[in-house]
């Protein structure tokens, strides 16, 4: 009988977006328990070793982390399998670099560099609101933060802006048609567009229709929608491609055009 948590993760069973090859080994780093789900996070070791190439082995990553160089959301993290996830800010003091984890249109976490100014805040989606003991209102965000005494206008599915130094809410965006959003799950993962309408289906999943900057429309579940800006002004800098997914033919044409201009 299995007692206790699983401690291993086979490479073949690891999430596809980590982009690990099957043949280099048997195991993958199993993320620690933390604010993001196992299949929706990127362990620190993969970010530092496989994406940034700052280390060649897991041992080297451990040495980097143990010198307390790596901060996630303003807190030093020494656990190499710490699960960083969507919207997290990773700062490396030594090099003065800051990254925000956001999806590219292929549904992977892009290495998206940001300025020191932008690294001071993050956006969080409100998952749940309730009134606790002694009538204190609370809300819970997508990255497992519990915040007491929020603005009474903030409801579930809205997005709040959090100052990472204090953990306080500085601003919020209502979930509303006409606002800019990013898709954080499903087949349209990583696409960015403006919310056009919301179909309510009581007892089932609400469906949200989104239109991207090229005028392509698509629909996804409400739970996959993360509002990132008022109107069409995003509150964070967007990764390369601006969240517009190209068809295979469009990608080919773009590649050929780039080849001709350089050749």
From Swiss-Prot:
Family matches, as SMART domains: S4 (SM00363)
Reported function: Component of the small ribosomal subunit. The ribosome is a large ribonucleoprotein complex responsible for the synthesis of proteins in the cell.
GO biological processes: translation
Family: Belongs to the eukaryotic ribosomal protein eS4 family.
The protein, known as: Small ribosomal subunit protein eS4
Subunit structure: Component of the small ribosomal subunit.
Pfam assignment, any one: Ribosomal_S4e
Domain called S4 RNA-binding: residue spans: 42-104
GO CC terms, sorted: cytoplasm; ribonucleoprotein complex; ribosome
Coiled coil: none
Entries under InterPro entries matching the protein: KOW (IPR005824), Rib_uL2_dom2 (IPR014722), Ribosomal_eS4 (IPR000876), Ribosomal_eS4_C (IPR032277), Ribosomal_eS4_central_region (IPR013845), Ribosomal_eS4_central_sf (IPR038237), Ribosomal_eS4_KOW (IPR041982), Ribosomal_eS4_N (IPR013843)
Domain of life: Eukaryota
């Amino acid at each position: 009988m299995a007692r206790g948590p699983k401690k291993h993760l086979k490479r073949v069973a690891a999430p596809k977006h980590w982009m690990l090859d099957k043949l280099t080994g048997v195991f993958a780093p199993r993320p620690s328990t933390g604010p993001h789900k196992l299949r929706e996070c990127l362990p620190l070791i993969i970010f530092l070793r496989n994406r940034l190439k700052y280390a060649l082995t897991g041992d080297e990553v451990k040495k980097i982390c143990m010198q307390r160089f790596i901060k996630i959301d303003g807190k030093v993290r020494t656990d190499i399998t710490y699960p960083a996830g969507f919207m997290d800010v990773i700062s490396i003091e030594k090099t003065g670099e800051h990254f925000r984890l956001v999806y590219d249109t292929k549904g992977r976490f892009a290495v998206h560099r940001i300025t020191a100014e932008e690294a001071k805040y993050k956006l969080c989606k409100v998952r749940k609101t309730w009134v606790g003991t002694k009538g204190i209102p609370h809300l819970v965000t997508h990255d497992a933060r519990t915040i007491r005494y929020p603005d009474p206008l903030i409801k579930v599915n809205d997005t709040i802006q959090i100052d990472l130094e204090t953990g306080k809410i500085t601003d919020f965006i209502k979930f509303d048609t006409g606002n800019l959003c990013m898709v954080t799950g499903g087949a349209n993962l990583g696409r960015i567009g403006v919310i056009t309408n919301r179909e309510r289906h009581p007892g089932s999943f609400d469906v949200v229709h989104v239109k991207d900057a090229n005028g392509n429309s698509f629909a996804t579940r409400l739970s996959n929608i993360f509002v990132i800006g008022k109107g069409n002004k995003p509150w964070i800098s967007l990764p390369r491609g601006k969240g517009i997914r190209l068809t295979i033919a469009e990608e080919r044409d773009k590649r050929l055009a780039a080849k001709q201009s350089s050749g």
